[in-house]
Amino acid sequence: KDNQPHHPFQTSWGVSTRLIGGVIMTHGDNNGLVLPPRIAPVQAMVIPVAMHKDGVLDAANALLDRLKAAGIRAKIDDSDQSMGWKAAEYEMKGVPLRVEIGPKDIEKNQCVLVRRDNGEKVFVSLDTLEETAKATLDAIHDGLYQRAKKNLEEHTFPAFSLEEAKQLQAEHGGFIKTM
């Protein structure tokens, strides 16, 4: 600055690490991460079922292109891993939505959406894929928010003295709101 050397300075509060930990503690489950769609690096993972059969990989790539064009952060897993491995992998990584398509789905002009938050599987017409995927991601986000809010409210207790706070903490744990 001003063509003169100056000592650099900055502050670091470790906030990014704390926020990541908060998301994991709030939304994680016994199967791994559960990421809210708005912060998930990958919102939807396209998984071709029996991808070596005619047309399946092409159909999966077409779904990927459509999801990306709709503004959804999506990727495809075209590896040779088994379907069960792929499903478990993206469940553990917290990808909010799995999009599966196989030969029978192509025949029926549909795909399967699987939600990470509750495991619900929905058969979706390919004609409404983008709208349904966006609505499902919004529903996942809203559901995670409401569940976290309810958990916070149920585990927050008011205390009017230090003794009361100690007693509440010993009996209930959770959060103490001092008044």
Q: Where are the predicted features?
A:
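NTP/phosphate- and nucleic-acid-binding module
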Residues: 1-179
